[in-house]
Amino acid sequence: MVQRFDVGPRLSEMAIHNGVCYLAGQVPEDATQDMAGQVAQVLGAIDALLARAGSDKRKILMCQIYIKDLADFPALNAVWEAWVPAGHAPPRATVQAHLAKPEWRVEMVVTAAL
């Protein structure tokens, strides 16, 4: 059985199946912030969704990160490394991309175990 959360006409924010939690792409709510601020917002949203599923960041299986500008890579990494618990850094890919809204600097897609 697939459990879906916050289902809308286009997407669900999260789905759970066979002990695995899949998050939709998470983007910042306040896109006026700099890269560090946007990353912190996105990681907070990920924390909240994983908590709703009964999981947490220590159980992330994979994170795909899309950034608007590669010059923001150091700022992304600084916030990420402060957020990830020691010994629990998941596999991760970071690519430059044109995001759906030009003011977004980052979007993250996470898969986690329950």
Task: Give residue spans per PLM region.
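Short, polar/acidic, helix-capping and beta-turn segments at strand->helix junctions
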Residues: M1-L114
